[in-house]
Amino acid sequence: MNKSQLYPDSPLTDQDFNQLDQTVIEAARRQLVGRRFIELYGPLGRGMQSVFNDIFMESHEAKMDFQGSFDTEVESSRRVNYTIPMLYKDFVLYWRDLEQSKALDIPIDFSVAANAARDVAFLEDQMIFHGSKEFDIPGLMNVKGRLTHLIGNWYESGNAFQDIVEARNKLLEMNHNGPYALVLSPELYSLLHRVHKDTNVLEIEHVRELITAGVFQSPVLKGKSGVIVNTGRNNLDLAISEDFETAYLGEEGMNHPFRVYETVVLRIKRPAAICTLIDPEE
């Protein structure tokens, strides 16, 4: 069903809705960081309100024998159920702007929708990295069972690369052999853009040779913090019921409120596939 049929009282045509949806999706893509290295599970459909998550520990190993006897150990150490929260931001299209667009035969300015999508995308990354206490959802930076690494002084050339190597080695010791993604706070990300000592190459170029799933920065990470993740849906994914939709909320005072929303939750299956970088002074 197209949007004009779904919302028959809306002032927008099918073409307008298509332009609105495209504007929202493009704005969200420019903002989102977590989705650049986390695989998606879904969309599951607008009726899905919860999803289970199997959490795996690192103690279970493969077996070798002649008969292949049944292993009584359960691979999944724990199963939890997450309520899938709605992330949303409302915006208003004013009736005078819509009438002007019709009278002059010009496109509708959907910049207000783009800004709403940007805010929802920021909230998604906030949930991915820091979780949600209200919904009991852990994030990459605070999930129990993750690895941690205390970083040195990145203002000295070479220290950043050395810390990333050591954090990666901790993941390797837990049999997480990549590919890895690295997300840094803006402060730490900027410090990678200096010449690596005894070379003519920026440190970030050497880091990218190790971190093959991408090196990113995110404004949701503050101070001197970061995280290295062994990517793959066996370690974590993003369960989605509805992905960046727009809805018409009904006329209000001659104007037309809309909503940008998504229903999404992070599922961390192997916490030991995550290593957070921590400033010892914080």
Curated annotation (Swiss-Prot):
SUPFAM superfamilies: Major capsid protein gp5 (SSF56563). GO terms for cellular component: encapsulin nanocompartment. The encapsulin and cargo pair can be overexpressed in E.coli and in human HEK293T cells. In HEK293T in the presence of 0.5 M ferrous ammonium sulfate nanocompartments can be detected and used as cell markers. Can also be targeted to cell membranes by addition of a farnesylation signal to its C-terminus. Coexpression of this nanocompartment with a smaller nanocompartment from M.xanthus (AC Q1D6H4) allows of expression of different sized iron-rich particles. The encapsulin shell proteins do not seem to mix. The keyword Transport applies. The empty encapsulin nanocompartment is stable until 86.6 degrees Celsius, when loaded with cargo protein is stable until 88.9 degrees Celsius and when grown in high-iron conditions is stable until 91.8 degrees Celsius. GO terms for biological process: intracellular iron ion homeostasis; iron ion transport. Shell component of a type 1 encapsulin nanocompartment. Assembles into proteinaceous icosahedral shells 42-43 nm in diameter with an iron- and phosphorus-rich core (1Fe:1.1P) which can store over 23,000-35,000 iron atoms (with a calculated maximum of 83,000 Fe). There are 2 types of negatively charged open pores in the cryo-electron structure; a 3-fold pore where 3 hexamers meet with a minimal size of 7.2 Angstroms and a 5-fold pore where pentamers meet with a minimal size of 2.3 Angstroms. The 2-fold pore seen in other encapsulin nanocompartments is closed. NCBIfam families: encap_f1. Formed of E- and discontuous A- and P-loops. A-loops form the main pores while A- and E-loops are the most flexible parts. E- and P-loops of neighboring monomers arrange head-to-tail and form a chainmail topology. This is Type 1 encapsulin shell protein. The lineage of its organism: Bacteria, Bacillati, Bacillota, Bacilli, Bacillales. The gene is enc.
